[in-house]
């Protein structure tokens, strides 16, 4: 576990299966966050390309935890899901999921943690807008979902597409209360 200061620890879980062309940029985008109290849990989910070799290049960083699964475990595999394995290894009070072909803007976590600090303690999840980036022609499109308020976390877990998948930052206790027994979380 890595904790640089007294700010709450944020764990970012990165599941990876055959994304060797993107994984380095993905991991680096978390390590370059302006919010410094982070740990990165990278799960190589049985990749058959060079993903694991690229992930291992980050093993020198104390903020990075690497989990190697010998074979691919698909979502919804119950107690053996890659997300559940990573969640159980994480130490953060807040959990984010970043897919291996995506990346964060440098101040994403800082802005979300600032928002948490301004909200009532009953708020369990905050999310943000994002961009869709098309590498082939180097274009980006702002991607916004409608705003939700109230007790939406259970619906978020069940529906899985209420917000941009990589945008939520969730209090650990929400996962512990709701559980990890669905397709999205395993």
Where are these regions (language model features)?
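Conserved donor nucleotide-binding strand/loop of the catalytic core
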Residues: 52-85, 89
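Conserved donor NDP-sugar-binding/catalytic core segment of glycosyltransferases
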Residues: 107-141
């Amino acid at each position: 576990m890595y904790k640089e200061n007294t700010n709450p620890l944020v764990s970012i879980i990165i599941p990876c299966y055959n994304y060797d062309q993107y994984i380095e940029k993905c991991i680096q985008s978390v390590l370059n966050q302006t919010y410094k109290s982070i740990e990165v849990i990278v799960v190589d989910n049985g990749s058959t390309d060079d993903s694991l070799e690229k992930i291992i290049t980050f093993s020198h960083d104390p903020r990075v935890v690497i989990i190697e699964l010998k074979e691919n475990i698909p979502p919804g595999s119950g107690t053996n899901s890659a997300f559940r394995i990573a969640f159980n290894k994480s130490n953060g009070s807040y959990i984010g999921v970043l897919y291996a072909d995506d990346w964060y803007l440098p101040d994403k976590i800082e802005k979300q943690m600032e928002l948490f600090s301004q909200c009532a303690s009953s708020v369990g999840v905050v999310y943000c807008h994002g961009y869709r980036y098309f590498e082939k022609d180097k274009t980006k499109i702002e991607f916004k979902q409608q705003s939700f308020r109230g007790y939406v976390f259970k619906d978020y877990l069940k529906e899985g597409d209420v917000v941009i998948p990589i945008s939520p930052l969730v209090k650990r206790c929400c996962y512990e209360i709701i559980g990890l027994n669905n397709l999205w979380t395993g």
